[in-house]
Every structure is written in C-alpha cells, then in structure tokens.
A protein has these predicted regions:
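Charged DNA-binding/catalytic regions of mobile-element recombinases
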Residues: 1-311
Length: 311
C-alpha cells in the first residue's frame, strides 16, 4: 500500500499513473488500497512510534549496558506496556545492545600448602538477611599511570557493594581500607557475619583476620581454588569491567588511577541504587534492603503490640 501511495502521482510519458492503473498492474483491487489507507493505525504501529524514544532513554540512563532482558524489565518497571520480543525488535531498529563480558583473567594462584581459613560457605552465595555473608576479591585495571588494584566487598543478600577501594598496590592495606568503608556503612559490630574470599595472601594475613574480628566477623576461604569458589565476587568484578572499565562511555584506556577511582565511585552508586539484579528479582539492591527492613520493622511492631495486648 505504501508503494501505491508513494507512486500514484508519478507521471510517465505524459500520463499520471493514478491508483487505478497501479492497482491493475499489481493485481490489487482499488478498494483494498482505499480500505488500507483509511484504516486506523494498529496498536503495534502506535506503540512502535512512541516506544523507541522511551527505550533509548532507559538504555542511556542505564549507562548503555542493558541487554534485551534487563531493558525489558526496566521498561516494565517504568510503566511501559511492552513485551520482550518487542523490546528486542526495537533495540535492533535503534542499533543498541547490551555490553558483553570477556573471559576472566586469573589473578590469584592459590598455594595448596598455605594455612587458610575454613570454607564456611560451600559455594552457597546467598543469605536470608543483610550482613550475614560478605564476599570480597581483588582485581586489577591497567592505566597509563600504572596498574590499579580494586577491592570490592559485597553483601550476598542484596548484592550491595558495602565497601570498596582503588589503590596503586595490592597490599593488605587495600583490603583493610575496603573493610573500613564496609564497617562505616554497615555498623561497627556485626556478630555472625562471614566474609568469604579466595586464597590470596591478603585474605590469609593476620591483620585481615584481626580487622574482621573487630566487627565480630569471621573470615572464610574456598577450598578448591577455582573461580566457582568465589563466584559472586567474580561476577561483580566481571560486571565492573564490562560496564565501567571497558564500558560504552569509556572505550579507550584509563589515564590515571585517580580517574578510575572517581568513575568507580559513580558506578558503585549506580550498582547499589539503580542497577537491576536478576538474582534478587530484577530490583536494585537498595530497594531490596529497604523492603527487608520495612517488613521486619512491621513484624517487630506487630509482635510488640501482641505482647502488650496479652498483659
């Protein structure tokens, strides 16, 4: 029908083509053309006219890292009536896509003879409340000014990054600084907390164990010595490198460690406050924790009222 509409006013050898002649050549009834021309736009046509702009804004606000599934979830959370297949189709038409993770680079070679903390996790990286299980790891990022070493501490319940540090070395102090940030953000005393890591020397040090003991936490280390023994921390490291270090907004190398540190601050805030995490139901970590504490506050108030009513 678009062909007829586009060509009906053309003139060939002094004669205007018109609808009737084109329909005769195409073996289409003129009434079919007029019916299609006068028909109201379909719901799909109308939505396809509006949704691309909305999707692009959501993708851009998500640091241009969301793929089909996460952008679809973000669109639904934003109140858009859209399906996953439609999201994929519109993303293709817009020429946008999610970031792709690269193969992990091994940074720690465990010493099987070294004394290490026991494995208290057994590859179960989940918990029923915040501050029951933290996981931590060190990774590195090359810059023009030298190698930057990055330590993250993640709460297994909500996937919140509770502490982090970017430094020019991978000494124990780098890990201790991340613990200090976590202690400042989560509380000075957290009895029953386990802090899981790989078998790097920083995490086997006496000072590391003593610092955790100060907040009531106990260190633990996986026993096998492969990425699955610290899978959650490895996942966050992978997200960090795909979304920030090699992300769409920074295609080239990082100039200085300070530049990377400032950018990491922004990424951690977005990771905690806005990024959707599939493992926790496609909500941001902050939203999950807020709901947890609100529910427990309500349960506590109900229990107190029940107790008072029985007196």
């Amino acid at each position: 029908m678009d062909f007829i509409q586009f060509n009906k006013d053309d003139v060939v050898e002094g004669l205007k083509l018109g609808v009737w002649l084109i329909c005769k050549v195409l073996q289409v009834a003129p009434s079919t053309y007029y019916a299609a021309r006068d028909r109201a736009p379909s719901a799909r046509t109308l939505s396809d006219a509006v949704l691309p702009g909305e999707l692009y804004s959501l993708w851009e606000n998500a640091r241009k890292v969301y793929g089909v599934r996460k952008l679809w979830k973000a669109a639904r959370r934003a109140g858009l009536s859209i399906g996953r297949d439609q999201t994929a189709r519109l993303m293709r038409s817009l020429g946008i896509e999610g970031v792709k993770r690269t193969k992990r680079v091994k940074t720690t070679t465990p010493d099987p003879t070294a004394v290490r903390h026991p494995d208290l996790v057994k590859r179960v990286f989940s918990s029923t409340a915040p501050n029951q299980l933290w996981v931590t790891d060190l990774t590195f990022v090359p810059t023009w000014a030298g190698v930057a070493y990055v330590c993250f501490i993640i709460d297994a319940y909500s996937r919140t990054i509770v502490g982090w540090r970017v430094a020019s070395n991978m000494k124990t102090e780098t890990v201790l600084d991340a613990i200090e940030m976590a202690r400042w953000s989560r509380g000075k005393k957290l009895p029953g907390l386990r802090c899981h890591s790989d078998a790097g020397s920083q995490f086997r040090s006496i000072r590391y164990g003593e610092r955790l003991a100060e907040i009531g936490a106990v260190p633990c280390i996986g026993t096998v010595g492969d990425p699955f023994d610290n899978a959650l921390a490895e996942t966050v490291n992978g997200d960090y490198k795909a979304e920030l270090v090699r992300g769409p907004d920074h295609p080239g190398p990082w100039k200085t460690i300070e530049e990377l540190e400032l950018a990491t601050l922004g990424w951690v805030h977005w990771h905690n406050q806005e990024r959707l995490h599939g493992f926790i139901g496609d909500v941001p970590p902050a939203e999950l924790e807020e709901a947890f504490y609100a529910e427990n506050l309500q349960a506590t108030a109900l229990a107190e009222n029940t107790t008072l009513g029985s007196l």
